[in-house]
Amino acid sequence: SGELATVVSKIIGYEQVVDDTDNWHEKAAIVGDPSTSGISCAITAENIGAVMEQYGVEDVRLKTSGGSYDSWMVDQLDEGVNFFNYRGYYGVSGFTNNDVDAANNGFKLPFATVITCGTGSFGSESQCLSEKFLRAGSSVSPKGAVACIGTATVGTHTMFNNAVNIGIYYGLFAQNLQTAGESLVAGKANLYQNYPSNPNNWVTIFTHWNNLMGDGATMLWTDTPVVMNVQHQNNIFQGDNYLSFNVTNPNGLPIEGALVTLMEDRSDFYLEGLTDSNGDVVIHLNDSETNISENIELTVSKFNHKPYLYDIEFQEEIYVPYASVETSSFNDSNNNGIMNPGETIQLSVPIHYDGSEVFSTMTATLSSDSEINTVFDEVYYGNIENGTNNPDQAFIFSLSDFEKHNTSIELYLTLTNS
């Protein structure tokens, strides 16, 4: 249970960017030791470093000569780097499990790849190097890596190791893959692409020997996480039937494609939406979900953006009037019950209220981001009281002659009282 708590803490801390100091997300330590397995190990390291630099990594540390590889790797891990890569030979140039334990990198946890003999032999060793990278530290004092790819057995071969290693980072950067598991698949795919005839069954063998210690769904940082500014209401009231959000970057520019999710502790409540080109998203609550009973957990996430977390507080004693699609009705021009292009629609929207307060002389205004022509966009409800409140007349609007089939038209009702 202690090891599991450590791993969970490391992954959550990594994904939530608990530590964003020292520009460590821009640092990568790449080793290619040619002393035993040959110059191709150095060339592999140079290739990986070049790919990282091409795709924006600012501080790529490359070591391919000069000895003292083990102490160099200890220093890099201890300082805190985003990527830690080794290509060399059995024994990892003297770098051991003890060296991982000696590091104090905290939540500056790299994605580690140690592609050589014996680093991923989890079935035959008490704790192989890839396991140590994942398990190192504690839940409150982490160290090591957030995930690590290693290679099982002492029978690996240089050319296949090189292909897997290059493919991992080509997948992450050139192919825009996002997770630890995807990067491993990319390494294996590159192996197959380079040796499609599967000579002596080596492709099959190496796709089994290379393995991941960690959660395959861990989203890896390939750039410094962007901080998102999220505008939203801090409370939700009885009767609220939608929540709106606006997401921007530190320069105030909209962030498109951010995933906004809403959750309660109860398992059946989960809603999500993606921000548009203006950074906006509206998440609708249907009737079954307006009966919210506790705070809502808001999470806004996007690749290479720091997640935004917030608890929207549920105000149990405060009720607001609301409209419902289920109780609204409309009349269309040809009375077929379907809104068609060019038709004029009469829309009747009752207002429901579950509280005890009385809202006097209430009016409602209809608006939309869709291409509709409003003929009568304001109606009078009088007093809004507990129960169902009907308007004195319907809203009237017409659809464009060019409206597409099955288009979703969002209508907004703004209530005001004197």
Ranges and model annotations:
Residues 234-239, 335-343:
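Short, solvent-exposed loop/linker segments at the N-terminal edge
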Residues 291-295, 300-315, 396-418:
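Terminal connector regions
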Residues 271-274, 278-282, 373-403:
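Intrinsically disordered, low-complexity Pro/Gly/Ser/Thr-rich segments with frequent PxxP/GP/PP motifs
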Residues 351-355:
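Asparagine-centered strand-capping/turn motif at beta-strand->loop junctions
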Residues 217-227, 315-327:
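Proline/serine/threonine-rich low-complexity linkers at boundaries of modular beta-sandwich domains
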Residues 1-307:
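Cysteine-dependent hydrolase recognition
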Residues 326-335:
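Short, solvent-exposed loop/edge segments of extracellular or virion-exposed proteins
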Residues 254-256, 356-362:
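Short acidic/proline- and small/hydrophobic-mixed sequence motifs that coincide with surface turns
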